[in-house]
Amino acid sequence: MSFNRCQTLVAAGLALCMSYVPMNVSAEGAIALPVPPLLESRSGQPLFLTLQKIHWSFDGKYSADIWGINGSSPGPTVRVKNGDDLKLIYSNRLPEAVSMTISGLQIPGTQIGGAARLISPNADWSPVIPIRQNAATLWYHANTQGKMGEQVHNGLLGMWIIEDDVTKNLRLPKHYGVDDFPIIIQDKRLDNFGVPEYKASEDGFLGDILLVNGVQDPYVEVSRGWVRLRLLNASNSRHYVMKISDGRPFSMIASDQGLLTVPVNVQALPLAPGERREVLIDMAKTQELTITAGESATFMDRVKGLFEPSNSLISTNVLTIKATGLMSLVTDGLPTQLAEDKTQVTSSIMQREIHLNDGFGINNAVLDTNRVDMTSRQGNWERWVITTNVPQAFHIEGVRFKVLNRNGQPTPPEDYGWKDTVWVDGRTELLVQMMQPSYNHFPFLFYSQNLEKADLGSAGQLVVSPQE
């Protein structure tokens, strides 16, 4: 029996795929979950974040030159308290200019970063940041105009945690790296030597491997009891649906802007780019489980991927959790009450229509830093109706909002609570509260959280006058 060249290539591809599958299985859970270093301000001392080139291994075999912060990628987790006044020193030791921001942090436009705070190579930026908001999981990242997708993909990101007296007094896991873990999810594409490959596309970057805290398919060992996971989708454009291997629901306790009023159970947990969700998992009577993020590539997808780039993930395993040893410090049931929300609408509500264009742009216009697209006043309430034909995430700086409905349907439990980032598929209505002031030279941005679309101009500028 003879083979032509095409049949030979396919046969070789099949053989390679079959040899690849058992290697994945044997290597499953072989890498321990890296926990980014914890960076806290003590006695008023400044915190330093150095943007630099680093060596990093995504697969445990090859080392690649990438970008990172303080020697790691993701960078260190910054932890602060409500009421702090934090001096933050960004030092740019990279060969190109970078601007940084902290998504979800409620601070004035003068301190939020962005184009007006571009940090040149070998220069610093040292804002003093007032922390005046409830406990929440946020994230800091590059948001350089026209370069955000590439620079975030290169490694300029990290988690940011705010604590307050409410969370301090709740019986929740809160020992960082022990029963309280940052879970930062990205998709990438690596060459044969473990070096990331990035190619911008109008549709958004999609990789074929899933990374958690910078590595593939990690495991973590925990004590028996409740485990808290702070989930962050730091991917450029990919949307995930998280599930637990034994079929149980996630106990979700917090969204982008902090604690929910009560825990909610969510069987399949969506996670859009830029979104954060805090969940609890009870490991008291479970030996091992795996969290996944959707459907992985099929056998034929892998064969096809040998001949052309594939957007399917080779594996969708996020994290394997293994319970060992004694019971943890937190073994009680979930608190029935998490946080109070006595917020009342205190102004008339104006409505805005925002359409995210099919290609790029918002309301048929691309970002122009010399143009203010919207004005409002601090403390105002607004109804934003977001529409799109191309599903994508959407983020607003300097505000918080609640999801009123999706395509006319009631808000699903996973969208309860205050947010700053939302997945838009069709029509989504938001109740927006203007929390902080911004100015003509230091405006807030609202933008597609599909970072490639944002880089092409799917963004606008918002100026919020200070409260009188």
What are these regions (language model features)?
Residues K402-E468:
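C-terminal soluble interaction/assembly domains
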Residues L88, P127, V279, I291-A293, ...:
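A generic structural signal for residues embedded in beta-strands
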Residues G146-G149, G155, T286-K322, Y447-L462:
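Terminal connector regions
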Residues S26-A272, V279, K285, T320-Q337, ...:
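Histidine-centered copper-binding motifs that mark active-site loops
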Residues S2-V10:
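Bacterial N-terminal signal peptides that target proteins for export
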Residues A11-Y20:
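Bacterial N-terminal signal peptides
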